[in-house]
Amino acid sequence: MLLTMNLQLFAHKKGGGSTSNGRDSESKRLGAKSADGQTVTGGSILYRQRGTKIYPGVNVGIGGDDTLFAKVDGVVRFERKGRDKKQVSVYPVAN
């Protein structure tokens, strides 16, 4: 009669978990800050991003960290730019 043994090895030191775990970066709050159709003032941040995920359109500037901002007061419009790109524009509203 042949006996088979099931031998399982487990960690014998578990105390290092609190040291090796427990690191997470703070969220960067990226993304849209103004919605399509929303009225904004000049200088308002429209979209925070890393790289040019969305391109600047009419009356929209781009900051050093690729943040898109309104250059004039107006209404925000998210539009397609070509086949696979997006852009955001701000169109002034006639009083």
Curated annotation (Swiss-Prot):
PROSITE patterns, from UniProt? RIBOSOMAL_L27
Gene3D superfamilies linked to this entry:
2.40.50.100
Q: Name one GO molecular function term.
A: structural constituent of ribosome
Q: How is it modified after translation?
A: The N-terminus is cleaved by ribosomal processing cysteine protease Prp.
Keywords attached to this Swiss-Prot or TrEMBL record, sorted alphabetically, are: Ribonucleoprotein, Ribosomal protein
Transport as UniProt keyword: no
Protein name, UniProt field: Large ribosomal subunit protein bL27
Task: Give the source species.
Answer: Enterococcus faecalis (strain ATCC 700802 / V583)
